[in-house]
Swiss-Prot record:
The keyword Ribosomal protein applies. HAMAP family: Ribosomal_S2_euk (MF_03015). It comes from Ostreococcus lucimarinus (strain CCE9901). The keyword Iron-sulfur does not apply. This is Small ribosomal subunit protein uS2. Its main location: cytoplasm. One of its GO terms (molecular function) is structural constituent of ribosome.
Length: 290
């Protein structure tokens, strides 16, 4: 029997399955410390042991905030928007999925002005605007950084693949679970009853196509049942197989006539004459030589 894996080993195995260790062909000089090795095709492999340690550090920072609403997580990349919303749902943080409005953290006259205590971003490149704004207000920033990501104004860099949908979903799932375990909401002895699949990005067009197929499959039996009900009402509930075929000839023979044919009443019409010479009923014929 194989020995049971520890929590760290199980998390690293999950990150390996999600592809969190796959970097890019380019490496930023500040991200070299997190690179384990370089493959033959040029892809750099990220050390997931360092990734897990940084996830624990980020979870401690988030738990230190007394009010969960003081934590804002952002994702301008489409693959990270669902993961951000799910993270906010389970941890109580605020989520900004989509385009960032400039001045959200610096313009006090803005209607959506916010003063969070911690900011979490999915990609330092696509989320460069909120990171630059946090530098003006001394806001701690946590970012998922790939091997080519710039670390300017990033306080806690979590090295991982931030371009794949499965990798982003897995990272936010692990971070949310760590936060809940440190708060005491989820027990470390028992596994979290939320599946990691809920954090993965889903294509809206693919979901719409699946819903249409399911609706069509559900409507087909209903239409067939309705047609059968109309047919039964019009032609009877009996099936065609239950109907007995009509007999070609009566099996009991023909019944005898009620009486003699000669006893029938004599006709009274113009064709009532019977027998005799032709024309006898038209009077005397003229002589032949007339």
């Amino acid at each position: 029997m194989a020995p049971q894996m520890s929590q760290k080993e199980a998390d690293i195995a999950m990150m390996l399955a999600a592809g969190c260790h796959l970097g890019t062909k380019n490496v930023d000089f500040q991200m070299e410390r997190y690179v384990w090795k370089r493959r033959a095709d040029g892809i750099h492999i990220i050390n997931l042991g360092r990734t897990w340690d940084k996830l624990m550090l980020a979870a401690r920072i988030i738990v230190a905030c007394e009010n969960p609403q003081d934590v804002i997580c952002q994702a301008a990349r489409p693959y990270g928007q669902r993961a951000v919303l799910k993270f906010a749902q389970y941890t109580g943080a605020k989520a900004i999925a989509g385009r960032h409005t400039p001045g959200t953290y610096t313009n006090q006259k803005d209607a959506i002005f916010a003063e969070p205590r911690v900011l979490i971003v999915t990609d330092p490149r696509t989320d460069a605007q909120p990171i630059s704004e946090t530098a003006y207000v001394n806001l701690p920033t946590i970012a998922f950084c790939d091997t080519d990501s710039p670390l300017k104004n990033v306080d806690v860099a979590i090295p991982a693949n931030n371009k794949a949908k499965h990798s982003i979903g897995c990272l936010y799932y692990l971070l949310a679970r760590m936060v809940l375990q440190m708060r005491g909401t989820v027990s470390a002895a028992n596994p979290w009853d939320v599946m990691v699949d809920l954090f993965f990005y889903r294509d809206p067009e693919e979901l719409e196509a699946k819903e249409e197929e399911a609706a069509a499959a559900a409507a087909a039996p209903a239409e067939s049942a309705g047609y059968n009900a109309v047919a039964d009402a019009a032609y009877g509930a009996e099936s065609w197989d239950e109907q007995k075929p009509a007999e070609a000839f009566p099996t009991g023979g023909f019944a005898p006539a009620a009486g003699n044919w000669s006893e029938a009443p004599a006709p009274t019409g113009w064709d009532a004459q019977q027998g005799g010479d032709f024309g006898s009923g038209f009077g005397a014929m003229p002589p032949q030589g007339y």
